[in-house]
Amino acid sequence: MDIIKTTGQMQQWSERVRKQGKTICLVPTMGYFHDGHLSLMDAGRTQADHLVVSLFVNPIQFGANEDLDAYPTDHDRDFKLAELKGAAVVFAPGPEELYPPGFQTAVTLSQLPLHLCGLSRPVHFQGVATVVTKLFNIVGPDVAVFGSKDFQQLQVIRRLVKDLNFNIRIMGCPIVREADGLAMSSRNLYLSADERNSALSLSCSLALAAEMVQAGETRCRPIIAAVEKFILGHQGTQVDYVCLCDPLTLEAVDTITSPVLLALAVQVGTTRLIDNQVIDPEQ
């Protein structure tokens, strides 16, 4: 496995691979791998001849007072895990490599970031869209794999690829959970034992909402109220949002007549966690 840290070397590697008639799958990450990341690599390895994993904690997707400086890193461990998963390359540039002095370009979307996480993290999706565009241009993948825990990010990237005519297939993979249901996240490391117990309220509240819909409730307001009440009944929780929305546009709905996305963002102690589930009233 190669570890590449400059854009020029990454582009040269990709050009050489394409000249050989081989395909590339990219798994973009911010590192500190858990089983969710590893499942993306497993999926990506089946989609192309070569797997490239990018490892970059993207500073421009963090707002003021967010956890950029505290975000966990262990590159040596990540390199070993990526190699075990069959990665041909880990692309691990530093911030100055992707954002050199004078950098002034940003990629923005006009509608999708106006919902869910975008309301409380106004710079986040501009940062995501910008770095993903750069990674696509540098690596030149045929396929890119993303997890669906950040469902909004997945939809932003799908729209980005469509709108900017990238010839890249986007593959979304299911959320990977701990045995007790907690969605895997690098930020789970921040949680104390008590906070981790409270964090289980997210996945349990998704199940509660699904049960209400299966029992015939189609009005969104009582479902949202029940979910918020359940989460806030756990110590140290603050709800950022609970939203039932259209899975494509992310616009909130009032009544459930077709599959909807239930998306949550909750502060547990000092840690912000997200989770989601698509709920189908016909099932």
Swiss-Prot record:
Task: Please list the residues that bind beta-alanine.
Answer: Q61
Q: Where in the cell is the protein located?
A: Cytoplasm
Instruction: Give the Gene3D superfamilies listed for this entry.
Output: HUPs (3.40.50.620), Pantoate-beta-alanine ligase, C-terminal domain (3.30.1300.10)
Q: Which residues cross the membrane?
A: none
Q: Name one GO cellular component term.
A: cytosol
Q: What is its main location?
A: cytoplasm
Matching InterPro entries:
Pantoate_ligase, Pantoate_ligase_C, Rossmann-like_a/b/a_fold
Q: Which cysteines are joined by disulfide bonds?
A: none
Residues that bind ATP: 30-37, 147-150, 176, 184-187
Annotated positions binding (R)-pantoate: Q61, Q153
List, alphabetically, the SUPFAM superfamilies matched: Nucleotidylyl transferase (SSF52374)
Catalysed transformations (reactions): (R)-pantoate + beta-alanine + ATP = (R)-pantothenate + AMP + diphosphate + H(+)
Which CDD domains does the protein's record reference? PanC
* UniProt keyword terms in alphabetical order: ATP-binding, Cytoplasm, Ligase, Nucleotide-binding, Pantothenate biosynthesis
Q: Which biological processes are named by the entry's GO terms?
A: pantothenate biosynthetic process
Q: Which GO terms describe its molecular function?
A: ATP binding; pantoate-beta-alanine ligase activity
What else is noted? The reaction proceeds by a bi uni uni bi ping pong mechanism.
Tell me the PANTHER family matching this sequence.
CYTIDYLATE KINASE/PANTOATE-BETA-ALANINE LIGASE, PANTOATE--BETA-ALANINE LIGASE
The family note in this entry says: Belongs to the pantothenate synthetase family.
The record's listing under HAMAP family reads:
PanC (MF_00158)
Question: What is annotated about its quaternary structure and interactions?
Answer: Homodimer.
Name of the protein in its database record = Pantothenate synthetase
Which source organism does the UniProt entry give? Answer: Desulforapulum autotrophicum (strain ATCC 43914 / DSM 3382 / VKM B-1955 / HRM2) (Desulfobacterium autotrophicum)
